[in-house]
Amino acid sequence: MAERIRQTIQSPYLPTAMVLSGWLLAALGYWGAWVWAAPVGLRVPGIDLAEYVKFIAEVRNGQIRLTREVFLFPLVAISLSMSLLAQRSELRLPSVLRWLINLLAIPVALAMLPPAWTPSLLTTPEFIKQTVAMAICIVAAGLSYPLLRRMPLTVSAIFVAILALASLVLPVSAFLKLRIPLDAIYGHPVDFGSGPILLTIGLLLVASSPLLLARRR
């Protein structure tokens, strides 16, 4: 058993399995329920929080101070890490899977679009920051093969790790500030869903994988 564990840890495919699992878990966590309720319609997924918090009275009147865009950070982390890592030969991914992940970075970025958006809405002060973030992610997806795969692995690894950790700490800590107003909205103590837990595990895996690759070089 100990020998099998040692072989698994030393396997060249371990970082690949970690980052693929990380992307999947982070996506499941972000699109999964952060506020749990038995009726499906009362559950709040992570992807809705950037809009949802605008309607919480304590946030609107400044009693709870948070920047709603932090709830979009996981999308930025998933999309940019896909663009930075998908085409890297060190991950030993099949060519088809490389391009699939590379292309998936674009719809992940587009998930930052506000509901019922129009081109003019995207340039308003309320949405310009997420529009810029979305544009950066889409451009990065286009540069993944010709440019980003040639970056030094250590640079990519450090950038992905910092981005993933920031995209974990900032939204989760902001979400925890909402516990009391959420209890008031629902009329009882709310149950948190599995979303934050899955996102945490996923982004920790995404942060660790390229660092492990860089350490093994």
What are these model-derived regions, one by one?
Residues 2-217:
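Compact integral membrane and secretory-pathway proteins
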